[in-house]
Amino acid sequence: MYHQLILMALIGVIMANVVPFSMSNIPEEYKEFIPEEVKNFYKNLSIFLCQILRELASKHATFTNEDAALEALKNKSDKLYQKAVELRNFVKAKIDSLKPDAKAFVDEIIAKVRSLRPEDGQKLDMEKLKQAARDIIAKYEALNEETKEELKATFPNTTKIITNEKFKRIANSFLQKN
């Protein structure tokens, strides 16, 4: 069960730090785990639009919040902005559909993952990431079964990933203390 949280944290950190500007950069064996909405976001992005994403990602520290980042995106490309808003609304609707305990848990994960984002020019601190994942796992394990089931039902692709044996092996080795 705790692997679900590892994945959510890792996906958040990865998305916050390295936008895979092309679906072709993702190994085939992992593409099946990517939600259709994310695939649709990246579908048919031109080199120019990918460059815009890279540029804005490199300036992440200058944005006070998501709305500021979206506004900067809108100033660069209305098409890319529309795609980003659509994806954001999809994720937000899923989170908003959760009952209070599950929603609070997801909001806490998002806040923790965002706090891990390195300052400009700095590298991601892997030990902090591992500790954050351990903390999230502990909080997840403390949730009641109803909340855990709601999270699984709301985020089925996450469940699909965490039940994958290969992913479990990778996650377990990642969290080993050095």
UniProtKB/Swiss-Prot annotation:
Subcellular location: Secreted
Cystine residue pairs: none
Keyword annotations: Coiled coil, Lipid-binding, Retinol-binding, Secreted, Signal, Vitamin A
Maturation and modification: Not glycosylated.
UniProt GO molecular function: fatty acid binding; retinal binding; retinol binding
Taxonomic superkingdom: Eukaryota
Coiled coil region boundaries: 67-89, 122-154
Keyword Coiled coil: yes
Stored Pfam families: Gp-FAR-1
InterPro entries found in the cross-reference section: Gp-FAR-1
GO cellular component: extracellular region
DNA damage in keyword set: no
Secretion signal span: 1-16
Family to which this protein belongs: Belongs to the fatty-acid and retinol-binding protein (FARBP) family.
Function: Binds retinol and different fatty acids.
Name of the protein described by the UniProt record: Fatty-acid and retinol-binding protein 1
UniProt source species: Litomosoides sigmodontis
Gene label: far-1
